[in-house]
UniProtKB/Swiss-Prot annotation:
This protein's encoding gene: hfq
Taxonomic placement: Bacteria, Thermotogati, Thermotogota, Thermotogae, Thermotogales
The entry's keywords: RNA-binding, Stress response
Stated family: Belongs to the Hfq family.
Subunit record text: Homohexamer.
Gene Ontology MF: a single term: RNA binding
Bilayer-spanning residue ranges: none
Statement: the UniProt record of this protein carries the keyword Zinc: no
Domain Sm, residue spans: 9-69
Record protein name field: RNA-binding protein Hfq
Signal peptide: none
Organism: Pseudothermotoga lettingae (strain ATCC BAA-301 / DSM 14385 / NBRC 107922 / TMO) (Thermotoga lettingae)
Function per UniProt: RNA chaperone that binds small regulatory RNA (sRNAs) and mRNAs to facilitate mRNA translational regulation in response to envelope stress, environmental stress and changes in metabolite concentrations. Also binds with high specificity to tRNAs.
Any one Gene Ontology BP term: regulation of translation, ncRNA-mediated
Gene3D superfamilies: 2.30.30.100
Amino acid sequence: MTEKFNLQDRFLNMLRTGKIEVKVYLVNGFQTKGIIRSFDSYTILLESENQQNLIYKHAISTIMPSSFVRLVKKEEEEQEGQTESATNKTQ
């Protein structure tokens, strides 16, 4: 059985493991920045300058990483390209 692709978890995990600084914009207009130390289904633990913030996901509007994050590995991109071209040929 193939693994289900969870975009949110993969994105947050890449930010966490890469220790990539992010800006987090909240729905109330507040913004903060730091490094994601952990996350679960409902919260994100953000660390900045020896301070920790536990932010509820429902309060987040946008997460902007300071650098580009590649979510799909090269092999997966090539496999998807082959699947798409095969699908286009049959149509």
